Amino acid sequence: MKYLTLLTVLSTALATPLQHQHHHHHEHARRAEVTKVVYVNGNGDEVQSQVTENASSGASSGETAETIQTRSSSDVSSSSDSNPVASIASSVASSASSILSNIEGDLSAFSSPSKKFEDGVYDCDSVPVGQGVIGVDWISGLNGGWTTIMNENGDTSLNCKDGYYCSYACQAGMSKTQWPSEQPSNGMSIGGLYCKNGKLYRSNTDNDYLCEWGSKDVNFVSEISEDVAICRTDYPGSENMNIPTLLSAGGKAPCSVVDGDTYFKWQGGKTSTQYYVNNAGVSVEDGCIWGTEGSGVGNWAPVVLGSGTTGGKTYLSLIPNPNNKDKPNYNIKIVGDDVNGDCKYENGQYNGSGSDGCTVTVNSGSAKFVFY
């Protein structure tokens, strides 16, 4: 089940998030692939083989186990002195480094984009990376680095093409600015750039840039020894949790906090940011996807976070995921300079005993989600 947290101002100091469930979503699940890796010597003779099954994004959707086997064999046999294990390890490390550099984006934290987007210039084939826009290239069933490709009828496509809205990801701390003011009446949402005659156009011409910063005062902070994949839902859009933030072990990353008074409205109601948080050690390409039942990743991740501002105050939430009651392999708490309320998820319990989640109001200063 996917749901969006709506932050509302209550008469009490503590806000309680409201939830709704859309009637439409499109699932992009990574398909399992069987890969046979064959090691050969300088004469081309097989010396060792290994078969693995995984949900891999390393191969394109058109690539089969046979072609992966052939590629691995030729790569390893190219030098009689090569170490096949080291070669594969190097390839994996290179791939991970490429993904990391891609999702980090090109802007330093809270540095404004400087180049206005030009309508009718960029081809629809791929997302126009830069100025805060990042490509998401591990989603099975989507090409070009897009996060959702959908038209007004709810039809989806592998490729961004004429008549479709092509949604995109922004780097951590930023939010997309593009969605049409006229939304479908059936409750689904659409967002992104519009493809017309093979070129990309803004669907919201009130904003010259594709990404914008939210509040500067909320961060994710890690006090643990493994990375955490924090996955924002693509909204307005499919609501699939494929917008990545990587919280490095012992590091910090900005949290996207949208202003509910000015950001996208769903049927007139204010909306906020929602994240699905995977167990520590799960990579963004494995965790920032639409997961499968029991997988523990994506929409089955153990923790959901909410953030947003309205009326000059910021609201931060820890929300139970009804898909997954298992406790994560970390604890998490919200702390700040001036907050009303107490909110933590420790040893599988909210605030020590509850199971209904919790919300705090940030009156002033900074706040953070601390993983410990």
Swiss-Prot record:
Glycans are attached at residues 54, 351. Induction: Expression is up-regulated during biofilm formation and down-regulated by RIM101, CYR1, RAS1, as well as by host macrophages. GO terms for cellular component: cell surface; extracellular region; fungal-type cell wall; mitochondrial inner membrane. Residues 51-85 are annotated as: Disordered. One of its GO terms (biological process) is fungal-type cell wall biogenesis. Pfam families: SUN. One of its GO terms (molecular function) is hydrolase activity, acting on glycosyl bonds. Residues 52-85 have a biased composition (Low complexity). InterPro entries: Beta-Glucosidase_SUN (IPR051526), SUN (IPR005556). It is found in: Secreted, Cell wall. Its EC number is 3.2.1.-. Residues 1-15 form the signal peptide. Its main location: secreted. Keywords: Carbohydrate metabolism, Cell wall, Cell wall biogenesis/degradation, Glycoprotein, Glycosidase, Hydrolase, Polysaccharide degradation, Secreted, Signal. Cell surface beta-glucosidase involved in cell wall maintenance and cytokinesis. Plays a role redundant to SUN41. Belongs to the SUN family. PANTHER family: BETA-GLUCOSIDASE-LIKE PROTEIN NCA3, MITOCHONDRIAL-RELATED (PTHR31316), SECRETED BETA-GLUCOSIDASE SIM1-RELATED (PTHR31316:SF0). This is Secreted beta-glucosidase SIM1. The gene is SIM1.
